Amino acid sequence: MSEEVGGEPDPERLAALEKRLSQLKKTEEAPKRAADGDLRMADMAWRMVIELVSGLGIGFGIGYGLDAVFGTQPFLMLIFVFLGLAAGVKVMLRSAADLTKAQARAAAAGKEGK
């Protein structure tokens, strides 16, 4: 090694090391961004599925409970299952619209940055 024990490190070697490290960091960041985008889309897909299923479940629960109270066995359950489905679809479509708006804003910001 070119440095003495307890001496200062060689500035040229440090600069070369920093340059190599920065190049390695740049090559590692590119795949990570693509993976983050895929994860974000998968998260949104699961969110939409959960919204739809929870709407159905809540509608079923309300309908079943009201049927048990009033003794109108399948009637209110069917009505509230369809209402829950409609509510779940409405919330799911709103989430899809928000995602579309966010992607449009990101695309517009990307074009302005270039």
From Swiss-Prot:
Protein name per its UniProtKB record: ATP synthase protein I
Location within or outside the cell:
Cellular chromatophore membrane
Per the similarity annotation, which family is this? Belongs to the bacterial AtpI family.
Q: Which gene encodes it?
A: atpI
Q: Which UniProt keywords apply?
A: CF(0), Hydrogen ion transport, Ion transport, Membrane, Transmembrane, Transmembrane helix, Transport
Its transmembrane ranges are 48-68, 69-89
Please provide the Gene Ontology terms (biological process) for this protein: proton transmembrane transport
The function of this protein is: A possible function for this protein is to guide the assembly of the membrane sector of the ATPase enzyme complex.
